[in-house]
From Swiss-Prot:
Keywords: DNA damage, DNA repair, DNA replication, Ligase, NAD. This is DNA ligase B. GO terms for molecular function: DNA ligase (NAD+) activity. SMART domains: LIGANc. Catalyzes the formation of phosphodiester linkages between 5'-phosphoryl and 3'-hydroxyl groups in double-stranded DNA using NAD as a coenzyme and as the energy source for the reaction. PANTHER family: DNA LIGASE, DNA LIGASE B. It catalyses: NAD(+) + (deoxyribonucleotide)n-3'-hydroxyl + 5'-phospho-(deoxyribonucleotide)m = (deoxyribonucleotide)n+m + AMP + beta-nicotinamide D-nucleotide. One of its GO terms (biological process) is DNA replication. Belongs to the NAD-dependent DNA ligase family. LigB subfamily. It comes from Yersinia pestis bv. Antiqua (strain Antiqua).
Amino acid sequence: MNILNLKIIMFLLISNTIVVGGAWATSTCPDWPATRIAVEINALEQQLNKWSAAYHQQGHSPVTDDIYDQLQDKLRVWQSCRGLPDKTESQPIPGKGQFLHPVAHSGLKKLKDETALTRWMAGRKNLWVQPKVDGVAVTLVYHGGKLVQLLSRGNGVKGQNWTEKAPFISAIPQYIANAPALLTLQGELFLLMDGHQQAKSGGVNARSTVAGALMRKSPSPLLAQVGVFIWAWPDGPTTMKEKVALLQVMGFPFTAKYSEPVMSHLDVVQWRQFWFQAPLPFVTDGVVVRQEEEPAGRYWQATPGQWSMAWKYPPLQHIAEVKDIHFTLGRTGKGTVVLEVLPIKIDDKWIRRVNIGSVTRWKQWDIAPGDHITLALAGHGIPRLDNVVWRVHQRNTITAPNWDKFHQLSCFQRLPHGCEPQFLSRLIWLSGPGGLDIGGIGGGFWQELIHHELINDLVGWLLLTPEQIASIPGIGNARAEKIYQQFQRAKQQPFSRWLLALGFPQVVSVDAQWQVVLRRSLSEWATMAGIGQMRAKQIKHFLDHPDVQALADFLSTQKVVGFELTE
């Protein structure tokens, strides 16, 4: 047995796609030389900066927030592997703006989970929670009550001047009576929604829609559908209660309606879940917890402050890192590619392997170890590859095995050379629910039989004695006797199940006999309901194959139902 076949066989034995329960560490250091990890850190950092610039300068990004945040977490892991400090939160936002903000946009640091939230809230008082509105961050500047500037966030220090668009956004007051002589507000321009439920509908591309309307040279009719949520009033009233009350009087009602005092992390958990499910007038992607006490505006910087934190909703898209690529040969001789990924948890399932189909499809995806992919759960909880979101800079060449000689009628025996993977797949199918459904018999057991040369063809296990089965390490006499009895009872399985277990390409009636099936002509098969000419040819090729006929002859000697000779 060559090394490639051994790897394929061992992979088949452990190829449970989803593992429920338990946990594996996903934040591990890659097994790369120091020079390579430095290159990969630099490449990922540059890409994240480009996406960040697009997000803050243009209001949209080629990747979702979920993807960006998870790749940023990966960058942190890689940096820690080299002993580098975490600069992801303190790094200035890339890009340039022309107009200076009176007060810098500080941004938000993201809390990882409830434990991090509890830790941050400890020792702090006068805390409030708000929905994290998903829109375009702006600064509103009023002089003597008159709106004089509407600036995009830009890089947090300077932004673009959108003041000419403000008159078309009815949610923005153009004049505020009794306003402070100089009033600076920071907030979010968002797309007004009618009962949007984040848990059901997701982000619906709302932020990009607003950004596109703001960046058009001519005013867009869409601006009439834009609302504003004020989340910061630098150098404003010292209490949140007074802030939201005055904001409502000035014409900004959403802040008062969606700001709630909280005493513990459980209050935040409750509001986060409520807003995730409740119908809201805007798209959200989490909650923001902020304390009343803030530094004076002149001390704000374009990096996350410590007086407010974001706790985002669980990601809709999940990133997995490809650890290895395996090529498996199925019972019909078709090769498939399975990606081994660093384990990730989606819902309540741990994912560590993803079947992506044929070698051709794998080549189209251009996936190599180290790449990062997005996964989702399809029907029956089976993981599905959605996209490749990040490709490593250094790509190791992987050559797929040549499986041209394998087909639907190859490898009913362990030999000739190279047949082990397909033969094992045939045995796994035979004992599985699609075949004879022999309980407790799977790939590990069949591989032990092959390894100890106790089985050479697809039905040779019927000849095994309890003593032979018990000779396999780890199988005692009691279990060996149980397996032996299971094998003997399998002889009484319906004929149709036996045919399927052997690989017959069509279900037949239970009362059929092997010799009856064998005597049918090609034209007779073709005229049967649901078969047709192509399937009829497959059936005849199967029935006429000498290996299949040899199996049938053996089953006849074992008095297996349907295979007995009739006079």
